[in-house]
């Protein structure tokens, strides 16, 4: 099994839910990314989503857009992000790392070269926001051949056909976007999430992580009651945007620890 699959199997065996925090590589300081990744793990992250900055992050709200702009202005590239993962792996061989980003940087590198470089760096999963599952069979096969889980998004508007298409190519877990719109949106409706997850699981035999709109321990716990994992990004990026540089890692670890405690108080995993 992959590191991601092992992680979710262990969580299920313990009756616990996953915590998947997101930060943008290179923001607020490229030299601090690896330190921040370790802070996430120390705070209780089960999987780390590391954003690859892109100039047109169409699915992201203003907080993550600004984060990408800052990282790009400081010279962050896909190559430097892979180097961050490699340096993280020097100390942490347990915590899975998922790269989340857009197709253009990967296509510039080439899927085969990317798969090899990501494997060698210690990447465990890849979520390419603008790769539709129906057109991703070759890409997903190349990732799986390199031991990397291809992860896909589903949304409240996803049809049964789209869910089935994801089921044909995804592995690791599925990222369910709980709201229409962009990351960081508010007005989380846990009952609608609970209603959608069985439809997903009937067609995709994978854990379901839920993100978009999770901003604190209370919303994280509410989502953990119905999902297999909680994904949180914009709130963490905002925390880093506002934190004093010398306090950023400690504040990040502390906030993630609060989320961890709240999630561990949630009910048993979704059926």
From Swiss-Prot:
It is an enzyme of class 4 (lyase). Signal peptide: none annotated. It catalyses: (1S,2R)-1-C-(indol-3-yl)glycerol 3-phosphate + L-serine = D-glyceraldehyde 3-phosphate + L-tryptophan + H2O. GO terms for molecular function: tryptophan synthase activity. The active site is at 49 (proton acceptor), 60 (proton acceptor). The keyword Amino-acid biosynthesis applies. It holds the Pfam family Trp_syntA. Its EC number is 4.2.1.20. Pathway: Amino-acid biosynthesis; L-tryptophan biosynthesis; L-tryptophan from chorismate: step 5/5. Tetramer of two alpha and two beta chains. The alpha subunit is responsible for the aldol cleavage of indoleglycerol phosphate to indole and glyceraldehyde 3-phosphate. Belongs to the TrpA family. This is Tryptophan synthase alpha chain. It comes from Burkholderia pseudomallei (strain 1106a). The lineage of its organism: Bacteria, Pseudomonadati, Pseudomonadota, Betaproteobacteria, Burkholderiales. The gene is trpA.
